[in-house]
C-alpha cells in the first residue's frame, strides 16, 4: 500500500495553483490592517463548511490532560441560594459549571465561535448566562473576542448579542428586567479606529441594542476603555466605573495614561462625575494604569486598587559610596570612570552578571587603554527585558473614597462635601504586582464587614482594618497571580479564589484551601514527545512550568489515593520549548521566558544552565518570550538556539558559538524585547540546512550549519518597520530537501488572517496556501501558530490556529476541520509521534490532546488521497480475535467485566448511522452493533463479539462481518473474520 500517496508533481501543481490565486487576492492590500469584526464572525460559516468537508472526524481523539496545574481564571458567578454551585470563566478555556463546590465541572461554552472569555454574569432565577468574550489582563496571550454572547438554555446554545468591536470585556453586570451593563475595554494592539467599542454600555432589550454611557472622551482620551464597573445594589442608578488607558505593541507596553480614571453616576449613566482629580487626593493621573473597584453598599464605601506607574522615589543611600547603576555610565568620560570607587565597580559587575573575566581591574585597564568606552557597561545591560523593570515604579496602591458622594454637577473639591481619596496604608505595597500590575486589578470587600478587604496580585492579601495593614491568606497549595475573589455574604469564612492555577476554595477564611482543578484547561505554549515505549508527552505552560506525562494518560481521581500524579514537573516559570534526546529519552532541554534554558536528566541528576551570553563591548542579545531551540535529529549532541542571532552548541549546550549577525530588522525602542528570533528548524533530510524566522517578519536560510545566511522571506503583506507579521513556524519537509513551509501571525496587530507559505526551491519562490478565496476549502480567518507534516504520508499537513486544528491531504492547498470534538481553542504547538502515528496537540486553554492517525495512514491509497470526495464505504479485515476464558467476568469483586474489543478499520463516506453484523456461514445474524451519528472519514469502529441473544460471547470459529449504513444507502460490505482458539 502506498504511503507517499501524493506525488511531487501533483503537489507542485497545487502550489503553483495556490500561488496564482494568492497573487490575485494579495494585490488588494499590502498592509497589515486590523481585521473587521464581520470577517471574524463569518468564521462560523467557514467552520461549518470545513466541518462538513472533514475526512478525519472519525479518528480517535482523546484528552490526555494534565489537569492538576489548571489554567487562568478570569471571572466566576456564584448561585446566591446555593454557594456550592458556581460558574467559572477561564481566559482561553471557556466556561465551566459546578454544583458540588468544585469537585466536578461540566463545560458550557465549547461549541461557540471561540473560547476566549473576559467576564460573565448569570441570572440564576431564569438560568440565563451572559459571556463577554476577550479577557482584559493584557498578557501576551490575551485573545480578542467578538462581543457578548447570551444563552437562555444553560449553555446548550449561544446567541451573539453585539459589541463585536469591543475585543476585550472586563465586567458584565445584570440590571433590573432585561437590562445589562458591559464594561468594554477595546482592542489591545490598535488605536485610532472609530468603529471600536470602548467604554460603559447599557442595554434594556437583552443586547438587541446598546447605548454608550461613558468612554474615554470624558477624560480627553477616546482610546481609553472600561475595565471595571460597580452597580449599587441599593440604588441601581448609582454607578462607579473605571477606565484604563493602555497601549500594547509587539515591542512596547504603555500600561497607563491620562485616560485612566474613576467616574461616578447617580442617574444610570446619563451623566458622570470625574473622581480621579489630584485635588481629591488621587495620584497624578498621567501615569495611572489599571484599576479595580470594590464597593460596600451598606456602608456606601468605595475601595480602589491602583496601578501607580509613577516612578518610585529614590531611597537615601545608607553607605558613603552610592551603588552604581547602568545609567550612571551614560555620557561618562574616561577621567570620571577612572575616579570611580573600585569596590563599587566590583559590586556593580558582580550584581549585574558580567562575565567573570570582566572584573574591576580588567575593566579599569580596558577603559584606560581606550579599548572600551564607559557606556559599554550600560549597553551590556541595555536589553528590552531590563527596561521592563527599570526604573522602579510605585506599583499597587489601595485608596478609599471618604465622605459623601459628589452631587451631580459639582466637579471641584470646593463644591464637594469633604469627599476625597485616602491611601489606606502608610507603607508601600511592595512585591504585590512588581512591574506588571496590568495583569491584576483584583480587590474585594467583605459584604458583611466594610473593613475586611482582599487584594490580589502575585500574592493574595487580606486586611481587616480597612486596608491599613495586610497579611497573606494564600497557602502552599494556592497558585500565585490572582484574578478573582468571591466572599460569601452569608458566611464570610467561605471564599472562592480564581488565579493562574485555577480555582481554590476555603471554608475557614484562608487558613486552609482546596484546589478544584479537575478541568483540563492548561495553557500550553509548546509540546514535545520522546521515543520511549510507551512514549511520553512533554509540555510547557503559561506560568505553570514544564511537565512530562504518559501518552496514555486518562483523567481520574486514583492519584488522590496513591499520591502519584502521572505527570511530573520538570521546570518552573513559564514553560517554553522542549527538546528530548531520544538516544536515552531522559536528557531533556527545557526553559522559561526570555531564553533561560537548562539541560537535565532525571536519572543521572545532571543539570546545566544554557544561555548564550554576549561579551562586554558587544550589543546585548535580544531574547523572545518563547525563545526557539532545536536539537538536531542528525546528531543529538548538536543544539541550536536563537536570540536575535543564531547560536550553536556541539556538546549538548555546554558551550555555544554565536555564528550569525543580527537576523532581524534590528532593535526597536520599547520595554518588550523585539527584533528576536521566534522560529528555528533544521531539515530532517540534510544536516546543517537551517531556517529561522523572526518576530519582525523575516526568514533566513543557512545551507552550512549557520555559518552563512541569506534572507528568503515569503511575500507576506508587511509594512516595515511598524507593521510586520510574526513568524510562528519554519518547517522543512520530510519529503523534499528543498521544500520549506513558513507561517505568519498578525495577532499583535489585531490582524487575524491566516498566512501559510510553501517553497519547493529552497525559498527562491513562494506560494501562499490555504487561501483559495472560498469558504469551502480555505483556512478560516484565524492566525496560524503551528504546522506539522506527516513523515509517512506526503502532503498530509495539520495546521493549528487561534481557533482550532485543520487538516490537509494535498500539501495545504485545501483544508478541512481536523475533528469536531476538539474545542475551538488556540492550538499553539503540534508534533507527530511517528512510530505510533499519533498527533499531539498542545492547546492554550484546554491542555493536551492526541489524535490517532493510524486508520488514516494505513487506509490511504494514492487514488483515495487525490479524490477523497469520491470515496465509498470501505473497510479492512480486522485482526482475528483470540478466545479467552473469562470473557464477561469481573476481574475482582466489584470491578468492571472483562469485555473483548475488536477494531474494524473503515472509511465512512457520509455522516450518519451505521451497523456492524456478525454472521455465521448460513448468514444468520449472531451479533450486531449499531453506531449512531458516525462522522465522515477514516476511523476504527470498536465492537464486542456479543451474541444478540445476550447469552455471552461468540465461540471460536469462522464468521462474516458485514458493514452497512442503517438506511441501506451505502450498500453492504462483508469480510471473513475468525475467533481462534487460545493456545496452550
Question: Which positions does each model-derived feature cover?
Answer:
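Bacterial N-terminal signal peptides
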Residues: 8-18
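A short tyrosine-centered beta-strand micro-motif
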Residues: 914, 939, 957-961
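Beta-propeller blade termini and top-face loops
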Residues: 25-892
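Contiguous beta-strand segments within globular domains
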Residues: 885-911, 940
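C-terminal tail/sorting-segment detector
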Residues: 963-984
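Glycine-centered tight-turn motifs at strand-turn-strand junctions
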Residues: 778-780, 925-953
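Beta-strand-rich binding/interaction modules
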Residues: 600, 911-927
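Sec/Tat signal peptide C-region and signal peptidase I cleavage site
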Residues: 20-23
